[in-house]
Amino acid sequence: MVLTNFFLRKKTSTTASIAKKRLHIIVTERKIDNTPELNYLPKFKKDLLRIIHQYIHEPKKISIQLQEQDNNAYMLQLTISFLTKNQDLINSKKQDNTTV
């Protein structure tokens, strides 16, 4: 009798299974809500620009765009225009002439 009771009894919920159910509910609610949680992006963009400006001093050469993709995914696109080698040489010669 004890053996059949062991196999036929209801299993009690463990702490892990309760936490899993709660997490599932939260994830489902966020998917339904469809509000993107991108509060960190303005600060991220500002930090990224600050770091890039240490090396590139012309703001017109830097472009940052935020694009929405499918399924509420976002893409942050960073474009930096660099000088060619010839332009670098010309600019460096101009700087050398002005420092003499």
Swiss-Prot record:
Keyword presence, tRNA-binding: no
InterPro entries named among the record's database cross-references: MinE (IPR005527), MinE_sf (IPR036707)
Keywords, in A-Z order: Cell cycle, Cell division
A single BP term in Gene Ontology: regulation of division septum assembly
Biological role stated in the UniProt entry: Prevents the cell division inhibition by proteins MinC and MinD at internal division sites while permitting inhibition at polar sites. This ensures cell division at the proper site by restricting the formation of a division septum at the midpoint of the long axis of the cell.
Record family assignment: Belongs to the MinE family.
Protein name in the entry: Cell division topological specificity factor
